[in-house]
Design a protein with these regions (language model features):
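Short secondary-structure capping/turn segments at boundaries of alpha-helices and beta-strands
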Residues: 14-18, 27-28, 75
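Long, hydrophobic N-terminal alpha-helical segment
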Residues: 1-19
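Short, structured protein-protein interaction patches enriched in aromatics and acidic/basic residues
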Residues: 3, 21-47
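Detector for the mature cores of small, proteolytically processed
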Residues: 37-93
């Protein structure tokens, strides 16, 4: 199961709460392509076909199909570096 830290949930709720994005919005995590290690993150108005939806405490994350096995059993965290927030997928301890 993919989970989120409290800070990650707060940031996801904050970045997806803009009225123009809509009530069904969330953060979408997607594979960057075959053989790529990187995952892309962006706001989305809703899940795309085939996305797995993870929701906790009002924070919604949409995982594209290729990303699911790469994040299964892991933890989404939000860290601040140089005044900017970055999302990090890490192992659960």
């Amino acid at each position: 199961m993919f989970t989120m830290t409290t800070k990650a949930r707060e940031v996801v709720r904050r970045v997806t709460s803009h009225p123009r994005i809509g009530a069904t919005s969330g953060l979408r995590i997607a594979s960057q392509g075959p053989g790529e290690d990187a995952l892309g993150v962006r706001t989305a108005t809703g899940p795309e076909r085939g996305d797995e939806v993870v929701e906790r405490d009002g924070a919604r994350v949409f995982l594209d199909e290729p990303a699911v096995p790469r994040v299964r059993g892991r933890l989404l965290d939000a860290v601040t570096r140089n005044g900017r927030v970055h999302f990090v997928v890490r192992n659960r301890h």
